[in-house]
């Protein structure tokens, strides 16, 4: 199986910024760490981290062919909590799929696994964000992960202490839900196939089958965040 990981923002766009970090930097860190674990189960590619996939999608100049992948995960950090002093509780983690996705087993497992490390689970939501919309339009299941809130002291305290564990949790959640086996295929090889004959009984792993479309996103960042995140919903500019 081939999986594409995309770090949100970059190429001059820092994303959300607070005293605890810059989104564009943390998304690059996360995709690289997720790849370290996930590469034991599948071929994992990174969208060029010096580029901005959202800007590329809007300009019609994406650096990859989504059709070459079995799953696409775009990584971001959320904002809007404006809890810079900390209130003793996290605002949490959430993940988005397009409105066309039929099942969300992979995404449910991802946020459950992150939440188990100390975050509130904000669940799986459906919004057509630009990059994942383009991936789904190419027939590929996709999701946009908001790891945690970059302007929440409690969130970022947990994240800073457990960032490598969070990345591993995301990778293992994907591998588990797709039924991937460690070392089962070499990088660049095709997933193992099995002939299905008439009358055969086929079991499909929950969460491993999808169908739909995807899009972009846009949201205003509070005063606590110095620069505005950019990714409008499909068909909008923000």
What are these regions (language model features)?
Residues 44-50, 121-127, 182-186:
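Surface-exposed patches in mature extracellular/periplasmic domains of secreted proteins
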Residues 4-6, 15, 65-67, 72-81, ...:
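Active-site-adjacent mobile loop/cap segments within catalytic or ligand-binding domains
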Residues 188-233:
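Beta-loop motif signature
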Residues 2-93, 98-99:
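Catalytic-core regions of hydrolytic enzymes
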Residues 29-39, 103-118, 155-183:
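Long, well-ordered alpha-helical scaffolding segments within enzyme catalytic domains
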Residues 14-20, 154-157, 214-217:
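Short acidic, glycine/proline-rich loop/turn micro-motifs
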Residues 10-12, 50-54, 77-83, 100-103, ...:
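Solvent-exposed loop/turn segments at secondary-structure junctions
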């Amino acid at each position: 199986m081939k999986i594409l990981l995309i770090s949100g923002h970059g190429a001059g766009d820092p994303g959300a910024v607070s005293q605890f970090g810059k989104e564009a930097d943390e998304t690059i860190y996360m995709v690289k760490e997720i790849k370290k674990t996930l590469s034991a189960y599948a071929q994992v590619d990174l969208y060029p981290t010096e580029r901005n996939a959202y800007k590329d999608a809007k300009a019609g100049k994406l650096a990859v062919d989504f059709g070459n992948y079995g799953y696409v995960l775009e990584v971001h950090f959320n904002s809007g909590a404006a809890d810079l002093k900390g209130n003793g509780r996290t605002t949490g983690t959430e993940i988005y799929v397009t409105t066309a996705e039929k099942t969300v087993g992979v995404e449910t497992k991802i946020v459950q696994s992150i939440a188990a490390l100390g975050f509130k689970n904000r669940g799986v939501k459906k919004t057509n964000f630009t990059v994942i919309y383009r991936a789904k339009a190419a027939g590929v299941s996709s999701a946009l992960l908001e790891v945690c809130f970059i302007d929440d002291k409690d969130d970022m305290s947990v994240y800073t202490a457990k960032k490598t564990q969070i990345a591993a949790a995301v990778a293992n959640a994907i591998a588990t839900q797709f039924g991937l086996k460690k070392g089962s295929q070499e990088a660049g090889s095709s997933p193992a196939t099995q002939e299905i004959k008439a009358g055969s009984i086929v079991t499909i792993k929950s969460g491993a089958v999808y169908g739909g479309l995807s899009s972009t996103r846009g949201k205003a960042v509070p005063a606590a965040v110095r620069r505005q995140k950019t990714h409008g919903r499909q068909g909008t500019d923000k």
